[in-house]
Amino acid sequence: MNLVVIGVNHKTAPVALRERLAFVGGDIQVAQAQLQQITAGSLIISTCNRTEIYALAPSTQLLANSDAALSKQSDLSLADEPVSTVDLTEQLITWLADFKQVPLEETRPYLYDYVDGQALTHMLRVAAGLDSMILGEPQIFGQIKRSVNQAKEQGFLTNQLNWVVEQIFAAAKRVRNETDVGTQAISLGYAASKLVTQIFDRPEETTFLLIAAGEMNRLVAQNIAGLGVKRILICNRTPERANLLAQELAHLGIQIEVHPLTELDSLLYQADIVSSCSGSMDMLIDKAMTRRALKKRRYKPMLMVDLAVPRDIDSSVGKLDDVYLYSIDDLQHVIAGNLEKRRQAAVEAELLVSHLVVEIERRFQVRKVGQDIHDYRALAAQKAEAVLNEALHELRTSEATAEEVMTELTRRLTQTLVHAPSSLMRRAARDGNNEAIDLIILGLKDAYRKK
């Protein structure tokens, strides 16, 4: 297959090095253009937790002079021999260090590299969330898809690498659909969003009230906003941070309002979902306030998530009918149980990954043989045409009879047809490979028998 991957991730490299090796902005386009010169297709995946380069080694390799291997200004020449995956791996490692201007000796100890089946396995594990910091998280799949789409738009994803990527995407979906590795919530934000879908049949019709615009509530907001809620109310002591969060969520096309914390009492009745994490020493929502809100909203159910320590919402609020109150401890208990379930599911997922990689390799071999047969037929037709042209020329210019020319044509075509298998059998005989000789002879006999 000639597939190579090199990279660093959160398990192999400290964040300081990952930052230096990350691709941002227009970096990827420039990098992909350079990689085109030494690969048969490449793909760069760069997130906060990993930087990886996937590439195919070409059968005929463009090489540059040794002191500027990938410079566009270098004089390029065709190599006589195919480039091995070992050679390409070394080229990619050297290129990455040069491109990011990080000394090779500082980079190499933290890099991992895989080829062919191991590279496929790694790529599938990454896409399925099995290699993520948060086991089974789905975000990496979307990040890879965006990288693939970008490479396609820029013309850097070759047909062969695109085929590999499509196989990986289909396999990753099977891993997530056929195992429970991604079904259990193991982050506070994701756990909160799961509660929303359990309580509300139509999250897109709900209003979400966010009390405080700190980091934890920001993560909750991202997850719940991703459900497509109709409206978000951000209630914060100061408008600056609330406005920043509003801008961050604005691209989702959701109606967003920013209010001062002093308006909380008058806003509460509008909220179907409440997430609070203020860091205040005072209780923000008590039982009486919630009763007023419930009455005003005609006792439609409310989900309240209190992530604050000390708590923002009086625990007695949870005793009210139509209120579902969850504290940070409640969510942590859910997450702990779910993490163990994910770990158990990951064992099953890893077995499925191994099976799917074998399937992909088999499909690749079938695809490759099909291309090899096509190329062989084209070469045979080219040789036959050359022999035919010689015969036609002889008919026009020599005194030979048509029968003599046809006899010579038949002889030459026969030599052309038997040359390749004869050479293979001689080579196999020299190598003592009797199995290959038997396979060739039996195959030829079977083919001629069918004719």
Curated annotation (Swiss-Prot):
Binding sites annotated in the UniProt record for NADP(+): 212-217
InterPro entries cross-referenced by the UniProt entry: 4pyrrol_synth_GluRdtase, 4pyrrol_synth_GluRdtase_dimer, 4pyrrol_synth_GluRdtase_N, GluRdtase_dimer_dom_sf, GluRdtase_N_sf, NAD(P)-bd_dom_sf, Shikm_DH/Glu-tRNA_Rdtase
GO molecular function, one term: glutamyl-tRNA reductase activity
Active site, UniProt feature: 48 (nucleophile)
SUPFAM superfamilies from the UniProt entry: Glutamyl tRNA-reductase catalytic, N-terminal domain, Glutamyl tRNA-reductase dimerization domain, NAD(P)-binding Rossmann-fold domains
Enzyme Commission designation: 1.2.1.70
Taxonomic superkingdom: Bacteria
Important for activity (site feature) positions: 122
Reaction it catalyzes: (S)-4-amino-5-oxopentanoate + tRNA(Glu) + NADP(+) = L-glutamyl-tRNA(Glu) + NADPH + H(+)
Binding annotation for substrate: 47-50, 132, 137-139, 143
Pathway: Porphyrin-containing compound metabolism; protoporphyrin-IX biosynthesis; 5-aminolevulinate from L-glutamyl-tRNA(Glu): step 1/2
Assigned protein family: Belongs to the glutamyl-tRNA reductase family.
SUBUNIT field: Homodimer.
Swiss-Prot/TrEMBL domain comment: Possesses an unusual extended V-shaped dimeric structure with each monomer consisting of three distinct domains arranged along a curved 'spinal' alpha-helix. The N-terminal catalytic domain specifically recognizes the glutamate moiety of the substrate. The second domain is the NADPH-binding domain, and the third C-terminal domain is responsible for dimerization.
Additional remark text: During catalysis, the active site Cys acts as a nucleophile attacking the alpha-carbonyl group of tRNA-bound glutamate with the formation of a thioester intermediate between enzyme and glutamate, and the concomitant release of tRNA(Glu). The thioester intermediate is finally reduced by direct hydride transfer from NADPH, to form the product GSA.
Function: Catalyzes the NADPH-dependent reduction of glutamyl-tRNA(Glu) to glutamate 1-semialdehyde (GSA).
PANTHER family per the UniProt record, alphabetical: GLUTAMYL-TRNA REDUCTASE (PTHR43013:SF1)
Name of the molecule in the record: Glutamyl-tRNA reductase
The organism of origin for this protein: Psychrobacter sp. (strain PRwf-1)
